[in-house]
Amino acid sequence: MFTVFLLVVLATTVVSFPSDRASDGRDDEAKDERSDMHESGRKGRGRCCHPACGPNYSCGR
């Protein structure tokens, strides 16, 4: 039973690492001014052409 517990803990730890690394790349892209995800200072609302931003930001294209 203890062995099964250890396997579950290790499996969840290994699976969670790649998702953390993927979000770091998105953060870098959002900070890049040339990216579609970058916010501009227009009218207090940013410009974002990424599909996830759709309801909150205008694309401006």
Swiss-Prot record:
InterPro entries from the UniProt entry: Conotoxin_a-typ, Conotoxin_a-typ_CS
Gene Ontology terms for molecular function: acetylcholine receptor inhibitor activity; ion channel regulator activity; toxin activity
PROSITE patterns: ALPHA_CONOTOXIN
Disulfide bonds: 48-53, 49-59
A Pfam family hit: Toxin_8
Propeptide segment residues: 17-43
Residue stretches of biased makeup (Basic and acidic residues): 21-42
Residues annotated with 4-hydroxyproline modification: 55
Keyword Nucleotide-binding: no
Keywords: Acetylcholine receptor inhibiting toxin, Amidation, Disulfide bond, Hydroxylation, Ion channel impairing toxin, Neurotoxin, Postsynaptic neurotoxin, Secreted, Signal, Toxin
Cysteine amide: residues carrying this PTM: 59
Subcellular location: Secreted
Region feature (Disordered): 19-46
GO CC term (a single one): host cell postsynaptic membrane
Record bears the keyword Ligase: no
Endpoints of the signal sequence: 1-16
Organs and tissues of expression: Expressed by the venom duct.
Protein purpose: Alpha-conotoxins act on postsynaptic membranes, they bind to the nicotinic acetylcholine receptors (nAChR) and thus inhibit them.
Similarity comment: Belongs to the conotoxin A superfamily.
Domain notes: The cysteine framework is I (CC-C-C). Alpha3/5 pattern.
Name of this protein: Alpha-conotoxin-like Sm1.1
Taxonomic lineage: Eukaryota, Metazoa, Spiralia, Lophotrochozoa, Mollusca
